[in-house]
């Protein structure tokens, strides 16, 4: 396991699940409007201004996780999408549901660019897929994440 990721997980009370969910929501908003990565940063700035109540529920480490994830996803947006496209067999990226795309973007960023353990990411992303997607979302997302993991080895 990546030592920095483990430290970040331990420091955040209750882990980073809440922050990860908020990252997903921001990415979902950008994907739903088919915006560019630059708009992810703008959406994040607006989010920070309008979400004082939620921001108050995040501890310092969760907020840092949220900020660094948004920055990292915005910087690597095109690369992340390319990785997902290469690992979706017989699926055009545009045909993937917005919920599933957003979840895959968050998971791919953490796994590839932060070297976070796939087991941790997959478990939380699958839970989010069950909560926000349809009854097949988690299976689809899990399959693509398995392909991404294989391609990284």
Curated annotation (Swiss-Prot):
Specify the superkingdom. Bacteria
Q: Pfam families this protein is in? A: NusB
Query: Could you tell me one molecular function GO term of this UniProt entry?
Result: RNA binding
Q: Which SUPFAM superfamilies match?
A: NusB-like
Gene3D superfamilies, per database record:
NusB-like
Q: Which PANTHER family match?
A: ANTITERMINATION NUSB DOMAIN-CONTAINING PROTEIN (PTHR11078:SF3), N UTILIZATION SUBSTANCE PROTEIN B-RELATED (PTHR11078)
Q: Which HAMAP family does its entry note?
A: NusB (MF_00073)
Q: What is this protein called?
A: Transcription antitermination protein NusB
């Amino acid at each position: 396991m990546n030592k920095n990721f483990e430290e970040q997980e331990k420091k955040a009370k209750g882990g980073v699940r809440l922050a990860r969910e908020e990252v997903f929501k921001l990415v979902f908003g950008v994907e739903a409007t088919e915006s560019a990565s630059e708009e992810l940063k703008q959406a994040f700035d607006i989010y920070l201004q309008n979400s004082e109540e939620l921001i108050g529920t995040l501890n310092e480490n969760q907020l840092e996780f949220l900020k660094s994830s948004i920055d990292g996803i915005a910087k690597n947006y095109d690369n992340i999408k390319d990785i997902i496209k290469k690992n979706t067999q017989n699926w055009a990226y545009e045909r993937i549901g917005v919920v599933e795309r957003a979840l895959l973007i968050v998971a791919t960023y953490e796994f590839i660019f932060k070297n976070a353990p796939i087991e941790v990411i997959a478990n939380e992303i699958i839970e989010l897929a069950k909560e926000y997607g349809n009854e097949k979302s988690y299976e689809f997302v899990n399959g693509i994440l398995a392909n991404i993991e294989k391609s990284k080895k």
